[in-house]
Amino acid sequence: MVVATMLGGMWVASRYLRAGLAGDAAIERAAVPPAQLALALLGTVLVVSGANALNMYIERDTDLLMERTRSRPLPARRLSPELALWFGIALSAASIPVLLVGVNATTGVLAAAALLSYVLVYTPLKRRTTLSLPIGAIPGAIPPLLGWTSVTGQIDAPGFLLFAVMFLWQIPHFLAISLFRQDEYQRAGLKVLPLEKGDLTTRRHIVGYLALLVLSSVLFVPLGVAGPVYLGAAILLGGAFFGLGVYGLRAGTGARWARQVFFASMVYLVLLFAALMIGA
């Protein structure tokens, strides 16, 4: 999913640049070499894989206490912790030079910031505060921005909007998980909103972030990134997703609703990015 959003950002950026240029010669001069795009994809895969490997190394004891993570290689003892650590370090160390040298400085710096904040800030904070979720959503939202900057070389309004949509999407997605798996989080000693503030507050947060997500998603149109086809899709998808969120404010909806939000969030993201790529 992470790499797919990066590719989506890359595709939309390419279409956006071409739409703003007049004449075949200008388009040809602005075209990004295929080798550079391939290196951008490679670097993104490396940095995401490296960050995940290091995260799993740090959380190997916690993962053993949770059903959703206990089958991972480290808690399941299919891989030694030392090997996982060096594997994560090697991937991470290789990723940044690939992006800095092979793509551009902006993409390399963003990837380094995402890697360091994910491993050194977000991961330790999960045991200390519920704010780890919005903090962790920052590096989690960078991949589509990496796709954008790998083509444009800069962070501008459309690129930041890609980041914002991905950031806002993650909050209800992971809050839904914390609702129907809160017993596992409690057993693992992780700080999540349902355990700290209760289910109703968590549901209200989900609805609030869904409202911001839907509003942000339509801003691609006034920015000139997408047209009416995308706008229609964004309104329909957003309306359905938001409606599901509001339904969860009713008493008695329970864990089943939270699971529905979780699965709906994945469908929503895939379809929204598909509509954006088609409508760009």
From Swiss-Prot:
Keywords: Cell inner membrane, Cell membrane, Heme biosynthesis, Membrane, Transferase, Transmembrane, Transmembrane helix. One of its GO terms (molecular function) is protoheme IX farnesyltransferase activity. This is Protoheme IX farnesyltransferase. Converts heme B (protoheme IX) to heme O by substitution of the vinyl group on carbon 2 of heme B porphyrin ring with a hydroxyethyl farnesyl side group. Its main location: membrane. The keyword Transferase applies. Its EC number is 2.5.1.141. It is a multi-pass membrane protein. Pathway: Porphyrin-containing compound metabolism; heme O biosynthesis; heme O from protoheme: step 1/1. Carbon 2 of the heme B porphyrin ring is defined according to the Fischer nomenclature. GO terms for biological process: heme O biosynthetic process. The keyword Transmembrane helix applies. InterPro entries: Protohaem_IX_farnesylTrfase, UbiA_prenyltransferase, UbiA_prenylTrfase_CS, UbiA_sf. It comes from Sorangium cellulosum (strain So ce56) (Polyangium cellulosum (strain So ce56)). It is found in: Cell inner membrane. One of its GO terms (cellular component) is plasma membrane. It comes from the Bacteria.
